[in-house]
């Protein structure tokens, strides 16, 4: 589980901003909201981020995705850039280093992984573990300007032999993290394996409002041999009053014609996929069929006839299945996209009531109705706000001094929590 994430000098973020899943001493629904990662240490399972347009909500999720990506993937060549921009709205930030640091827990041990970089290279990287009250270094790297290379050193507790250490150090180019280089090595099992596995399968890609979740649903139905996930999805749809009684996946194949072969060869898809399609000589088609109860019986509708809201909630139900059955961290941007507020609230309640593991959800949203709900703890709510210089500031509701008797929804509407977007006159000068 993630305890804390710090970001500095990344897109709209200039000064160091910290997102924390450490709870306050609020007693509200502790058993639903908190998970014990070690004796005496509990972390929040959920985070909700509000903010006006262009205030930096998505930047926060992008920073997490960037951090995960740099820990997993080695650049194609050593001359590739880091793939980001620093804060650009002043004369000095673009010349300074950026930094990120994540504190997280695995197997009841606390890890701290930090990174300092710019657009061209990584300057510092360190991974520490707390097996006691004192930190132990697993590895560190530093950039040597004189020789233009990164020096990597491993701690005695890393569990990695000297030969593997040399191989990892040799693969750690200036634009590649030690973790990504480790992922390319044939190393024996160590604590680094657990860290790499967390970034690979524990943290998931951000779900954006542009993502079609229908592909996820089809993939789950295709591999659902015992219909467990299908029953879960139908249970969700029934409870949400969608009038859908069954789901099925209609699959078919079509032979590739010479004209289709030309289209495939020029299509923006991976070469491996093109080769496999042409080798097979057929294209696979699949479509979800929805069975509804109507006047006089059961009726089947093709997926293209279902609403965007139905598809989105079905996809969100797949997400819910995963966080309930696997220990995942899943970021969701604009979680309210295409679904009614009551369904959004129901989704959150379902997660809180049924989550027994260490899964976490981090959601951004524009829907302020959640601020009016009694079941939402104040320490899970965050706001992104812009300074006069255009820099994103991350503020926690529980730290804003709002009296416990005051409704956060009304305080937000009155501009007592963060600045609301300034809207000009509704009358336009039509002569311009």
Residue ranges and their predicted role:
Residues 1-4, 346-432:
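C-terminal lobe/lid and adjacent interdomain/linker elements of RecA-like ASCE P-loop ATPase modules
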Residues 2-66, 432:
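Pre-Walker A-like glycine/lysine-rich segment at the N-terminus of P-loop NTPase domains
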Residues 10, 334-339, 368:
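Conserved Walker B
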Residues 34-48, 52, 61-122:
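Conserved P-loop NTP-binding catalytic core
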Residues 41-42, 93-95, 105-108, 321-324, ...:
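Conserved catalytic network of the ASCE P-loop NTPase/AAA+ motor domain
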Residues 46-49, 263-321, 329, 335-339:
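Conserved ABC ATPase signature
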Residues 112-258:
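Electropositive, glycine-dotted interaction segments
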Residues 340-345:
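Short alpha-helix of the ABC ATPase nucleotide-binding domain corresponding to the H-loop/switch region
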């Amino acid at each position: 589980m993630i305890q804390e994430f710090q970001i500095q000098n990344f897109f709209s973020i200039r000064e160091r901003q910290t997102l924390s899943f450490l709870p306050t001493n609020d007693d509200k629904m502790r058993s639903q909201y908190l998970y014990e990662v070690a004796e005496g240490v509990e972390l929040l399972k959920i985070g909700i981020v509000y903010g006006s347009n262009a205030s930096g909500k998505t930047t926060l999720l992008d920073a997490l995705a960037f951090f995960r990506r740099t820990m997993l993937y080695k650049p194609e060549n050593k001359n590739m850039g880091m793939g980001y921009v620093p804060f650009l709205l002043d004369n000095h930030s673009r010349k300074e280093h950026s930094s990120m640091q994540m504190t997280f827990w695995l197997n009841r041990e606390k890890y701290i992984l930090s990174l300092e970089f710019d657009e061209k290279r990584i300057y510092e990287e360190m991974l520490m573990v707390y097996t006691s009250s004192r930190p132990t270094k697993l590895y560190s790297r530093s950039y040597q300007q004189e020789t233009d290379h990164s020096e990597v050193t491993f701690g005695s507790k890393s569990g990695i032999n000297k030969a593997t250490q040399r191989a990892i150090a040799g693969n750690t180019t200036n634009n590649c993290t030690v973790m990504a280089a480790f992922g390319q090595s044939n190393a024996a099992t160590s604590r680094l394996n657990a860290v790499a596995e967390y970034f690979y399968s524990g943290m998931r890609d951000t779900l954006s409002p542009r993502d079609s979740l229908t592909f996820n649903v089809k993939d789950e139905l295709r591999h659902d041999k015992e219909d467990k996930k299908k029953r879960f999805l139908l249970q969700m749809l029934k409870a949400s009053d969608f009038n859908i009684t069954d789901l099925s996946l209609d699959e078919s194949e079509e032979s590739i014609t010479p004209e289709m072969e030309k289209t495939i060869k020029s299509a923006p898809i991976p070469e491996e996929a093109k080769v496999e399609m042409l080798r097979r000589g057929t294209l696979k088609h699949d479509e979800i069929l929805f069975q509804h109860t109507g006047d006089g019986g059961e009726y089947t509708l093709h997926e293209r006839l279902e609403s965007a809201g139905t598809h989105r909630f079905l996809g969100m139900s797949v997400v819910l299945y995963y966080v309930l059955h696997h220990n995942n961290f899943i970021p969701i941007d604009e979680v309210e996209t295409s679904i009614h507020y009551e369904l959004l609230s129901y989704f959150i309640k379902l997660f809180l009531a049924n989550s027994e593991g260490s899964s976490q959800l981090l959601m951004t949203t524009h829907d302020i109705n959640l601020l009016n709900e009694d079941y939402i703890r104040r320490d899970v709510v965050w706001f992104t706000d812009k300074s006069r210089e255009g820099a994103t500031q991350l503020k926690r509701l529980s730290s804003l001094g709002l009296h416990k008797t005051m409704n956060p929804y009304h305080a937000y509407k009155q501009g007592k929590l963060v600045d609301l977007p300034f809207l000009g006159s509704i009358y336009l000068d039509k002569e311009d």
